[in-house]
Amino acid sequence: MKRHPFIILLSLVTIFVMILTACAAPTPAPTEKPAEPAQPAETKAPEPEKPSLPAFDKACTPDDEGTVKPVDMQPDKPMKIAVLGLENNPFWIPVKEGTMKAAEELKPYGVTVDWIVPGDQHTAEVFGGAIEAAVAQEYDAIATIAGDAGVAPFMDKAVGAGIPVATFNSETATPNKRAFFVGADLYLQGQTACKAMAEAIGGKGKVAIITGFFAVEAHELRRTGFVDECKKSFPDIEVVGEVENLDKGDTAYTQAQDFMSANPDLVGIYVTAGGPFGAAAAVEDAGKAGKVWVVSFDFVEETMQFVDKGVIYATIGQDPFAQGHDPAIRLFNYLVGDVVPECGRLVTRADIVTKKNIADFWTPK
């Protein structure tokens, strides 16, 4: 039987495909590469915790007030400390001198201490803004006056960002996260001032009060301390008026004149803050030295001159040099050496200077 050529061709193609399939090498199945052992993640050693700070209200007067030394330890990197103060009256001159001394002592350790004056008033707007600026400029620590309660949230925010904050000279009674305070017991100073006034005027008579700022909590503590003590212990002392002089001597001069004109029988003027020499000058110019007594604070040159003349009966100190010096040193010691102040409120000495003992505290220039 004759085969069709197409069938023969199809058979040949089929046989050829079968031969190729049989001869093809089998493709090995893919094999998975064994997984490499997991490498442990790099872990950064946690920062050691700082020691606990003393209780906010625990008070003491340290033996090394004004002379505290830096710990002899080199920090890991250069550091910056901001000290926020004022220069609106002569009181601040020795405060700044204290800060400059601290800067000199800390310089060998690679620490820069900057004295910064953000304005001429103690307000939260001024000093809160200055604290925010110091945080933005990456200061390692901040020391500030805090006489306005509104400053507290700014301090707490800085501490929350890892920057310790200390206060000096004046602070709010509102609890906050500041590390420590260096300055006077202001309410007690007001009480002491009342006792000095009572001694000067024989425990009775009309007295006027010139405060720095009613809005500054520190000045209010001195004012209320005076008023409360006089009411309690010397009820025959009558406060005839209270004004604020914004820490200015020339304003105190005019206010003292006004008080003496309105009250011819005035026997005392109590100045809680800056500018007492202005009130004393008004008393002297009115010819009433020894009849109208001034009681004040601080040992600035002009004030001491009027103590020496017998116009200011007593002026009460607060160690301004220590207030400017100690915060920067103690902040450094805390950051670098974990040295914690012994108290939360490091109360400065409150020496009382009168004409009788002025030679122990002042030499005329």
PLM feature segments, named:
Residues L20-E32:
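Bacterial lipoprotein signal-peptidase II cleavage site
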Residues K44-K77, A218, E229, S233, ...:
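Hinge/cleft segment of the Venus flytrap/periplasmic-binding protein
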Residues F56-P75, M79-G98, A102, L106, ...:
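Extracytoplasmic "Venus flytrap"
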Residues C60-K69, F181-V207, L221, A252-Y253, ...:
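Hydrophobic alpha-helical segments within soluble ligand-binding/sensing domains
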Residues D64-V68, V111-Q137, G241-A262, P276-A279:
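Structural motif
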Residues F91-K107, Q189-A193, E217-I237, T251, ...:
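Short, solvent-exposed amphipathic alpha-helices that sit
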Residues T144-G160, F226, E244-M304:
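Hydrophobic alpha-helical
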Residues A149-L188, K206, V300-D308, I312-Y313, ...:
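Flexible loop/hinge segments that line or gate small-molecule binding clefts
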